[in-house]
């Protein structure tokens, strides 16, 4: 989990979670990011819909745990809207492997 785009690499603003995870783990990782204050209504901006962000990340985690053919999922960016307005994956790449659960 991290700041989107090249900022993730430039700033090193990332958090790594090992599956399985619980929603509280995802939320804690988000809150450890340098960009976390932006989700709290920084300088008058709307508070971010962290529930939706956590739900999106949990859905990706569930997919990874339940489908042996999935190798990696990258969403960049996951755009987090204002409180109660959701989150949307603007772009995603999914890498598949040859493992069919053997």
Q: Can you name each region flagged by the protein language model?
A:
Residues 1-102:
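ATP-dependent carboxylate/acyl-activation modules
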């Amino acid at each position: 989990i991290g700041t989107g785009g090249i900022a993730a690499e430039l700033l090193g603003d990332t958090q790594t979670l090992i599956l399985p995870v619980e929603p509280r783990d995802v939320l804690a990782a988000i809150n450890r990011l340098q960009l976390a204050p932006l989700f709290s209504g920084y300088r008058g901006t709307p508070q971010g819909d962290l529930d939706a962000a956590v739900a999106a990340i949990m859905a990706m985690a569930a997919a990874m745990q339940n489908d042996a053919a999935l190798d990696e999922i990258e969403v960049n960016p996951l755009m987090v809207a204002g409180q109660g307005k959701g989150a949307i994956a603007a772009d995603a790449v999914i890498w598949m492997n040859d493992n069919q659960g053997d």
